[in-house]
A protein has these predicted regions:
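Beta-hairpin "wing" of winged helix-turn-helix
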Residues: 44-60, 65
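Basic, amphipathic "hinge/linker" alpha-helix immediately C-terminal to the N-terminal HTH DNA-binding motif
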Residues: 59-78
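Basic amphipathic alpha-helical segments that dock to polyanions
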Residues: 36-37, 43
């Protein structure tokens, strides 16, 4: 969900995704690039995300882009997440 959420804001390259998750979570999630790429590959295989190569300065960088199917799945996941949080809050009485 976190990766799709970030890509819903803008196309990003792998290291940028890692840095953004670490930054926004204030260090609560310390995602490593080695953990990220298998997830990205599964998202690509599922048609949720696509990738493209772009030259930035003298470097070739791979950017990831959320597709329509990914946006739809993100919406579903967010609804599921909200339902879970609502249920937990009812149980905890908050």
């Amino acid at each position: 969900m976190l990766i799709l959420r970030l890509l819903d804001e803008e196309d990003m390259y792998g290291y940028q995704i890692v840095q953004e998750i670490n930054k926004r979570s204030e260090g609560m999630f310390t995602l490593k690039e080695g953990s990220l790429y298998p997830v990205l590959y599964r998202l690509i295989e599922g048609g949720l995300v696509s990738d493209r190569m772009e030259i930035v300065g003298k470097r070739l960088r791979k950017y990831y882009h959320i597709e329509t199917k990914g946006k739809e799945r993100l919406k579903e996941i967010r609804q599921e997440y909200n339902n879970i949080i609502t249920g937990i809050n009812k149980i905890l009485g908050t």
